[in-house]
């Protein structure tokens, strides 16, 4: 055993050993002794370790009899403890905390094992789609049985992979090999459910008319104008579409890789729109990018879009973004946007878990431009292509502009072959605000963007889901993403962490190919008035388009929501019964 003189401060940890040291440490760290002399302590091997043991139960029994210098313990249920606490309160007020309980530790878990996090985001959206389209088929009267067992199996498999060492990126290599196989199982199963339920929906709309149509599925709870893509054999009719047979409220564009892009106007909310081809010849539509100027190498220097005047420096970096709607420059004077920086990332401990406060002290530009040119330009989108090299890694980006939204997409492929280096992108913006908004689960949280206190300084890396936003009165900008979670906004600089390649516990973490998209979205008003939430959902959940024959040309919505501040995220069958 141990004597109390050997443990003057006790011990506390998430592995509760239920010994005198543990109990003493819990009592010493308890801050509200004047309010109640009872405190709840949990015991057992945590961190996936198996829970309480026989030895712990015996130690607890002995401590109930009393150990000198150690508070007396009593076995009870958590519910009973709160009843005791309520009785002891005697109208006293317990202190409360309003705001975020920020953990000043393990900031790297927002980014480590990026492929796993991308799988998770994709599967969450895909499972939501599978549930909704299954409901849609049922509500529209199709001969389709709601696949409750398959959906439950997929959700449970997805939740297993949200275990606290898998999703954060702090497991060994074998775990991620198994996890990738399981995510692919979910994608295959949920993808099959989506295809079968959509086919069932289309069967309800069948008619003898054999005219060719485009069927557009929108799983989101708001009507939207957005881009949909057909690839492979489905895209072979691009030339026919461009020659005027496409429906009048749809623009079309062929991409260099043979896919066909469609700009769908006003796709119905949580439903399907069917559009018949038009026989009239349409006028040539203006491309998104105009007034393009290039240097002697053919690299873009400046151009206009419906929303911006863009300028690039001799290194292929964005040095000007003038918002034509507001006639204002978005970037800080002398700064560059989408600045890709590589930082040395060697935390003092817990390599995959941590990012240390001094990581910014050693950094390099992800320079070495190999190619930079206008890759595609049409009525649906205009895209620049740029390829860069840093040491043994290559990064390719398509920077895409659109006619219907001020969102600028950075579609990224990175062949990453570095260790203990961290990649971030930054946008220094000419927007003044003392706080910013970050998305959390089904909500958002405000955080300061200054460094007044040590608490503020400690928030050099925070968590966000699909978006973060910096707005002043009447104007702002958001950074959106399709699979990233670590970010930071300080002194009007918005930064998103893209890759963190630690070497423990997985020596090959984050090596190889990465594909992801992040976006800059300047907007009027704050994030609510500027439509940031909808734009982030649109990035993560694109429209689905199919070529069909012999179906009714009509639109059908499961629901419509008039208020922009209300969003229906999930529609599914009840767990029991046949209700929704």
Regions inferred by a protein language model and the residue ranges of each:
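C-terminal (or distal) subdomains of carbohydrate-active enzymes
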Residues: 10-19, 69, 184-191, 195, ...
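Catalytic grooves of carbohydrate-active enzymes
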Residues: 1-205, 219, 473-546
């Amino acid at each position: 055993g141990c004597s109390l003189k050997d443990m003057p401060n006790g011990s506390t940890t998430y592995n509760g050993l239920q010994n005198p040291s543990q109990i003493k440490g819990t009592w010493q760290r308890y801050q509200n002794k004047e309010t109640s002399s009872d405190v709840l302590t949990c015991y057992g091997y945590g961190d996936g370790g198996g829970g309480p043991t026989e030895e712990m139960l015996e130690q607890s029994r002995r401590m109930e009899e009393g150990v000198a210098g150690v508070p007396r313990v009593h076995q009870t249920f958590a519910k009973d403890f709160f009843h005791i606490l309520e009785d002891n309160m005697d109208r006293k007020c317990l202190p409360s905390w309003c705001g975020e309980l920020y953990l000043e530790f393990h900031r790297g878990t927002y980014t480590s094992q990026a492929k796993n996090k991308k799988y998770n985001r994709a599967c969450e959206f895909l499972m939501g789609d599978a549930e909704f389209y299954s409901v849609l088929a049922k509500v529209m009267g199709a001969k389709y049985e709601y696949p409750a067992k398959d959906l439950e199996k997929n959700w449970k498999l997805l939740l297993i992979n949200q275990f606290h060492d898998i999703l954060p990126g702090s497991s060994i290599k074998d775990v991620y090999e198994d996890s990738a196989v399981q995510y692919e199982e979910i994608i295959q199963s949920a993808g099959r459910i989506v295809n079968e339920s959509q086919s069932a929906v289309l069967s309800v709309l069948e008619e003898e008319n054999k005219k060719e149509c485009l069927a557009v599925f929108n799983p989101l709870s708001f009507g939207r104008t957005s881009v949909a893509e057909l690839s492979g054999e489905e895209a072979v009719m691009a030339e026919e579409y461009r020659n005027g047979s496409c429906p009048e409220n749809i623009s079309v564009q062929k991409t260099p890789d043979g896919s066909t892009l469609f700009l769908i106007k006003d796709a119905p909310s949580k439903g399907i729109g069917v559009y018949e081809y038009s026989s009239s010849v349409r006028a040539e539509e203006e491309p998104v990018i105009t007034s393009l100027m290039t240097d002697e190498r053919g690299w873009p220097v400046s151009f206009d879009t419906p929303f911006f005047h863009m300028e690039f420096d001799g290194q292929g970096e964005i040095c000007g973004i003038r918002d034509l709607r507001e006639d204002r420059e978005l970037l800080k004077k002398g700064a560059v946007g989408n600045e890709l920086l590589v930082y040395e990332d060697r935390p003092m401990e817990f390599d995959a878990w941590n990012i240390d406060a001094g990581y910014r002290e050693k950094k390099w530009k992800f320079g070495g431009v190999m190619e930079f040119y206008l890759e595609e330009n049409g009525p649906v989108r205009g895209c620049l292509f740029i390829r860069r090299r840093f040491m043994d890694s290559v990064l390719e980006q398509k920077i895409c502009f659109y006619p219907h939204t001020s969102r600028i997409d950075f579609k990224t492929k990175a062949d990453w072959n570095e260790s203990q280096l961290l990649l971030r992108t930054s946008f220094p913006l000419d927007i003044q605000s003392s706080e910013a908004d970050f998305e959390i689960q089904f909500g958002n949280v405000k955080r300061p963007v200054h460094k007044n206190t040590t608490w503020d300084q400690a928030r050099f890396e925070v968590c966000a889901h699909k978006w973060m936003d910096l707005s002043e009165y009447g104007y702002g900008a958001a950074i959106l993403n399709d699979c990233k979670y670590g970010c930071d906004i300080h002194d009007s600089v918005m930064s998103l962490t893209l890759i963190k390649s630690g070497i423990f516990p997985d020596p090959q973490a984050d090596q190889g190919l990465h594909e992801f998209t992040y976006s800059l979205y300047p907007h009027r008003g704050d994030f609510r008035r500027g439509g940031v939430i909808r734009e982030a959902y649109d990035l993560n959940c694109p429209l689905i388009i199919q070529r069909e024959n012999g179906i009714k040309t009509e639109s059908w919505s499961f629901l419509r929501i008039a208020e922009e501040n209300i969003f229906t995220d999930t529609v599914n069958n009840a767990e029991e019964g046949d209700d929704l």
